[in-house]
Amino acid sequence: MRRRSSLVLLACAVFFTALSPLMRWYAFPRLAKIPPGQYQDMVLEARPATLLNYGTMKAERVPKVTIVQTLKGDVAASDRIERSAGRDIVVWDALSYVAGPDGKMVSAIPERYLFDAHSQEPVHATGEMVDGDPVRREGIEFKWPFLTERRDYTYFDAQTRTSAPIHYKGTRTFRGLEVYYFEQTIPWTRVALPKKMPVKGITPQSVAKMGTTRWYTTKRMFWVEPVTGAPVNGQEIHKEELRGGDLLPGGGKVTAFAGHVKMRADYVDSTVALVTSQRTLVLLLTRYLPWGFLLLGAVLLALSLYLEARGRRPAPTAARPPAPEAAAGGGAAGGGAAGGGAAGGGAAGGGP
């Protein structure tokens, strides 16, 4: 019975030990992915900011500028592209909506971003665009890969429509989470005017005819939770200018927008809470279950060997009872005792 139990435990030990690396290196890469129908929004603010007044064509100091970013998954488009690509694809329709202190639109730039649901690598297909212009992304945007590494990545900049390195600058603690801090600086670059302008009658084409161009620079900062690859905080030191042409008095330059853009505090709180819960699920597949299965396999193996050793130990032999003494020998011994008594009597009698 012990030998049979030992074999069962040994089989279980082998199973759980083999399951440990399979969970980490086979199951995790296939199970961890971005859902295609995900929706999320984020509000960022620059307080205070500099904003161009298109009525006077002069830059003005304003109390705040609000930027609302939304990401919405297009499930139908994902399914259609998956059938031809043969892998899990996510299609995000993003919108960056900038509003002045009065709530009126300053700009609205849509994007369509396609990427691999598991690795976050960009996928190139029809419909990939920024503000209606076809683009071909290289590197990441919005999110880092699961199990982010301490290294530089290539990050896509939607304003310039180009990719550039975003540099790993160290490990920090943010709201109780260990995060990786990344920075990217885009130098002054000529960029396209938004298709939607804040003043009726002014279009990118009419501005271009006047010879006026738009220039942009930014310092981009992200605090990324490395297990999920999700940014828990983001900031930009952002500046835009209009330069030259007949639109500006004297053909000089004017600040169109400048400010230190930060995530609003309530959105930071909700993002940290969401990422913390998702982090637990990823750790379950990459750390808790693999190490738990490995430890369980070791315990079962030790128990199996213990039962096997006990099963092979020889059973103790029963003690044999002593052989009974012969009856004749007992009578002679009794006679000797009687004779001793007589000798004692003789000694007593010899006293007087």
Each model region followed by its residue ranges:
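Extracellular or lumenal secretory-pathway regions
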Residues: R2-R150, V261-L289, F293-L296, L300, ...
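A generic alpha-helix propensity feature with a strong bias for hydrophobic helices
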Residues: T66, M197, G201, V207, ...
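Solvent-exposed, non-transmembrane amphipathic alpha-helical segments
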Residues: G176, I202, G244, P249-G251, ...
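Cytoplasmic C-terminal tails of single-pass
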Residues: R313-P352
